[in-house]
């Protein structure tokens, strides 16, 4: 007995050990899960949007239980009924006996386990669709009806998706219940197979018949709902979206017939529960399947093939017209002003006199090119950086509005020479200051002219909080804050030689969860997998942890229902640097509206195309404007489109999270702009839907597209992005800050694609009155060029620039040396009664610390071009010696007064002979240039160019002959000639 106990004791001990280990592992896993959830609560609580998190959690939990119970309970009931109503003395074959012997010990586990497992899967699926249920419960009427069923569009946006989802879920529950019933009845003898004979017990017959009847009823409801879904489906060879002739004449009536037939067959199954005769429901089911094939597929195909296709244009016209009107409504294009524009191509003297204000604001600083200039002139230390693409905004200076290229000096820890947890987390925590350059000016050596610059900040913006704790390049997390008596350890900004006079600061805002107890520190140590959060003495009771610092991500967390614009831009507003972010409400359920991929629509040179995006939409509104404070990360949401029914619905779900427009300050409105992503979507749709006549739309003989960016790679072309400019469109009383794009024909022929067909601009200025949006904001104006006009498009203009003998000679010579030539954005402006093209040309040396300088400006009007050192000179050259207007670079300032900044490293390396930091020698600015008839250059420049040409020829000849000594001598002469040419230009 003792021996047996000894044998059992190790087994019990091992079981106890394994049980203990299992419990410990489970507790650790649960604690990790809890830590993540608790960290979210702390973050949202400090963020001020805890209700957003809890609403999502409660809604998902509620939907989980609905899904769990909706699946598990019916499944458990049918299994229990099938088992309890089994025939007690049924004669089973040997095979079923073996099955029962295997299953019986696990019967109780299976009867509860199977419903629970299926219930969990169903609950998870239902929880993921909480938004669909919430939108159905809180749906808002749209105020318009669809043209076919005459139901409010809100039914399609909010109710129909939920109804179809609910019916689909119920159908899955009933189908799984039917399969479970059949399996249980078979295992326990309620269904017996004897040769060709199938015997079904009465109780099983009733249960199976009722479940089958319910399933067919649900299929009838599903088919009935499918009728309404036809108005949101693609049709007519994807030409339009929504029900077309075949749908209205065949598919929808056929679906109604099938729905009624399904109900009839369901009644036959219900009758069978009492009569026991399976012949009628089985025959009815077979006929239903045949009817589905004939009525649901063959008949619509025949109508389409033999009736519609021979007369498609005539029969589809009313439905195409419905699609045109719905699409323009859904994408905000209903109120667009279309103006015929008979553009002249004659560049006459004084042609720009009536457009003097627009001409003065033409931007020559390309935000996609001059980031290295900001980097070298305003970086100051390697641990600061600027984004690759800068932003365009406007500021009111001395009573007038001025376009500016702006950015913030963000922290870039990859530039630190000494990396450690202490430095990365508690010392280098934030960027510093705004940097802004005039969009229409340049210094004498081609550098940007800064209106706000330096560390500490100086310029025209006045006093504001310059520290950037929340930005697009901020570290993953930083720990900030300390007691008032403690010494500051956060580096604020450098100063003096070798950083001998560095300034330190302590974060004093409320920007992140507090680390005032060991539990919070442990939670975040687990979240970021970093034990130093617990161990470091730099963390104190006043410390805060800042994370999730990207402005777009923060707005997305505050409003998870929004689709975010791809760009956030900084502005100095009410004494703070704030990021302005645009949010959209979207849907793909708008009746008859064109469906397109959002990612495809916004892809261009500035926004790369997403390879795996699933973001088809057919409705979009810029419903929310948001700001993110760069110092403390606080987010404020404003209902920009308060009439949007989708936004109204979400406001019911998340009440008190969005402020009205009346709460927006005057300074904030001054920096609000029309969002570029929305404009890109609208232009992609307008390429086809500018045609409002259904017949013309069907023939697609006037379809447009956005031209490729002339500055993109020929091997991988991308669309030209829209550009922000202050300009006066034909019909406007004064210039406004606008966003524009151009259109060319959508055709396979290269010759036809080069012609400009349309010019779309939107008023992007929201005004400067507190709580009131300017009446013109968002007004779309389309200049439609006559088909007989042959105005060159951006691609053809770029070809003209490149093929001009004088222009190409000078630029090609520059490219042969140790310099790179970069063409800036090719701008198009409707001025002078025609279309003016402006393109800045930048030159930079090939050194690592070089940066682009503005060397020349190319302009074109009609077939004439000019190539000068400044825009003002180029316009005068283009328009017969006097354009009638003055550009912003007519009085080029001296560099010390214009650049206003230093640099890190050899910032002054340039192709123009070198400029150093905030000052330097001139790199252009002479009056030499070329019109369409050639360049009027000084003798020194011509001589230097001839010498360079000869040296290049000699070098090529030496290369072919294999004479390396002669090759080296010729190359040396080429470099000397190029430097002489640049020096001659600078005089």
From Swiss-Prot:
Protein name (record): UPF0182 protein Lxx09300
Ranges annotated as biased composition (Gly residues): 897-932
Record keywords: Cell membrane, Membrane, Transmembrane, Transmembrane helix
Region entry Disordered, spans: 700-719, 886-947
Coiled coil ranges: none
Domain of life: Bacteria
Transmembrane segments: 17-37, 59-79, 108-128, 167-187, 206-226, 256-276, 283-303
Localization annotation: Cell membrane
Primary residence: membrane
GO cellular component assignments: extracellular region; plasma membrane
Similarity remark: Belongs to the UPF0182 family.
PANTHER family: UPF0182 PROTEIN SLL1060
Membrane topology of the entry: Multi-pass membrane protein
Comp. bias regions, Low complexity: 705-719, 933-947
């Amino acid at each position: 007995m003792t021996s047996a106990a000894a044998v059992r004791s190790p087994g019990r001990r091992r079981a106890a050990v394994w049980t203990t280990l299992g419990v410990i592992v489970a507790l650790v896993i649960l604690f990790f899960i809890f830590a993540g959830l608790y960290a979210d609560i702390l973050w949202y609580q400090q963020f001020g949007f805890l209700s957003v998190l809890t609403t999502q959690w409660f809604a998902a939990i509620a939907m989980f239980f609905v899904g769990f119970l909706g699946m598990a309970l019916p499944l458990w009931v049918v299994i229990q009924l099938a088992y309890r109503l089994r025939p007690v003395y049924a004669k089973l074959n040997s095979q079923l006996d073996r099955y029962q012997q295997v299953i019986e010990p696990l019967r109780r586990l299976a009867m509860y386990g199977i419903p629970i497992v299926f219930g969990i899967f169903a609950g998870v699926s239902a929880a993921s669709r909480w938004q669909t249920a919430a939108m159905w419960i809180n749906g808002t009427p749209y105020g318009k009806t669809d043209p076919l069923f005459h139901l409010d569009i809100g039914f399609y946006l909010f109710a129909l998706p939920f109804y179809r989802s609910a019916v689909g879920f119920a159908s899955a529950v009933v189908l799984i219940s039917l399969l479970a019933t059949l399996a249980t009845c078979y295992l326990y003898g309620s269904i017996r197979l004897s040769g060709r004979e199938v015997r079904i017990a009465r109780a099983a017959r009733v249960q199976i018949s009722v479940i089958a009847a319910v399933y067919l009823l649900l299929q009838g409801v599903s088919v009935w709902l499918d009728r309404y879904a036809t108005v949101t489906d693609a049709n007519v060879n994807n030409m339009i979206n929504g029900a077309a002739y075949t749908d209205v004449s065949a598919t929808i009536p056929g679906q109604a017939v099938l729905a009624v037939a399904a109900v009839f067959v369901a009644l036959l199954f219900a009758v069978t529960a009492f009569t026991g005769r399976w012949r009628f429901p089985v025959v009815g089911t077979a006929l239903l399947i045949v009817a589905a094939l004939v009525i649901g597929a063959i008949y619509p195909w025949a109508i389409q093939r033999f009736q519609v296709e021979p007369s498609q244009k005539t029969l589809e016209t009313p439905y195409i017209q419905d699609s045109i009107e719905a699409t323009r409504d859904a994408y905000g294009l209903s109120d667009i002003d279309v103006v015929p524009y008979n553009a002249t191509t004659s560049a006459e003297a004084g042609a720009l006199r009536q457009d003097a204000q627009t001409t003065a604001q033409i931007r020559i600083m390309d935000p996609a090119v001059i980031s290295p200039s900001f980097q070298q002139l305003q970086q100051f230390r390697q641990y600061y950086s600027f984004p690759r693409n800068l932003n365009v905004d406007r500021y009111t200076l001395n009573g007038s509005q001025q376009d500016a290229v702006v950015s913030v000096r963000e922290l870039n820890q990859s530039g630190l020479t000494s990396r450690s947890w202490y430095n990365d987390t508690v010392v280098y925590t934030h960027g510093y200051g705004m940097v802004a350059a005039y969009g229409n000016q340049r210094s004498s050596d081609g550098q940007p002219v800064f209106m706000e610059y330096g560390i500490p900040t100086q310029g025209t913006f006045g006093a504001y909080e310059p520290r950037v704790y929340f930005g697009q390049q901020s570290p993953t997390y930083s720990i900030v804050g300390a007691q008032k008596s403690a010494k500051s350890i956060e580096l604020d900004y450098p100063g003096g030689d070798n950083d001998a006079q560095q300034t330190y600061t302590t974060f004093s805002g409320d920007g992140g969860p507090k680390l005032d107890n060991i539990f919070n520190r442990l939670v975040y140590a687990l979240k970021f997998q970093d034990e130093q959060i617990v161990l470091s003495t730099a963390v104190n009771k006043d410390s805060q942890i800042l994370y999730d610092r990207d402005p777009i991500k923060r707005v997305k967390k505050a409003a998870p229902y929004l689709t975010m614009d791809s760009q956030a831009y900084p502005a100095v507003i009410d004494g703070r640097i704030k990021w302005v972010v645009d949010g959209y409400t979207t849907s793909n359920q708008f009746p008859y509206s064109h469906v397109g991929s959002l990612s495809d629509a916004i892809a261009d040179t500035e926004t790369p195309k997403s390879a795996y995006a699933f973001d088809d939409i057919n409705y979009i509104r810029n419903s929310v404007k948001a700001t993110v404070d760069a110092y403390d990360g606080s987010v404020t949401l404003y209902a920009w489109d308060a009439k949007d029914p989708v936004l109204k619905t979400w406001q019911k779900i998340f009440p008190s999270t969005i402020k009205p427009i009346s709460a927006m300050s005057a300074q904030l409105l001054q920096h609000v702009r029309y969002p570029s992503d929305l404009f890109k979507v609208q232009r992609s749709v307008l390429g086809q839907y500018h045609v409002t006549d259904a017949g013309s739309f069907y023939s697609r003989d006037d379809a447009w597209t956005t031209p490729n960016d002339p500055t993109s790679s020929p091997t991988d072309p991308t669309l030209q992005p829209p550009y922000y400019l202050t300009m006066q469109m034909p019909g406007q009383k004064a210039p406004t800050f606008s966003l524009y794009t151009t259109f060319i024909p959508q055709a396979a022929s290269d010759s036809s694609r080069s012609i400009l067909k349309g010019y779309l601009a939107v008023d992007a200025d929201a005004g400067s009155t507190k709580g009131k949006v300017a009446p013109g904001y968002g007004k779309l104006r389309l200049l439609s060029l006559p088909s007989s006009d042959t105005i060159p498009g951006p691609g053809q203009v770029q070809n003209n620039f490149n093929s001009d003998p004088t222009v190409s000679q000078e630029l090609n010579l520059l490219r042969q040396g140790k310099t790179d030539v970069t063409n800036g954005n090719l701008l198009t402006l409707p001025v002078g009664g025609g279309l003016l093209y402006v393109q800045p040309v930048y030159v930079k040396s090939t050194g690592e610390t070089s940066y682009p300088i503005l060397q020349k400006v190319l302009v074109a009007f009609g077939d004439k071009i000019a190539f000068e050192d400044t825009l003002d000179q180029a316009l005068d050259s283009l328009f017969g010696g006097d354009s009638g207007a003055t550009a912003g670079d007519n009085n080029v300032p001296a560099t010390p007064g214009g650049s206003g900044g230093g640099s890190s490293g050899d910032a002054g390396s340039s192709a123009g002979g070198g400029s150093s930091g905030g000052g330097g020698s001139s790199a252009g600015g002479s009056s030499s240039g070329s019109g369409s008839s050639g360049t009027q250059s000084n003798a020194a420049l011509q001589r230097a160019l001839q010498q360079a040409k000869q040296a290049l020829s000699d070098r090529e000849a030496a290369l072919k002959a294999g004479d390396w000594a002669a090759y080296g001598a010729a190359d040396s002469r080429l470099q000397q000639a190029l430097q002489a040419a640049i020096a001659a230009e600078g005089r």
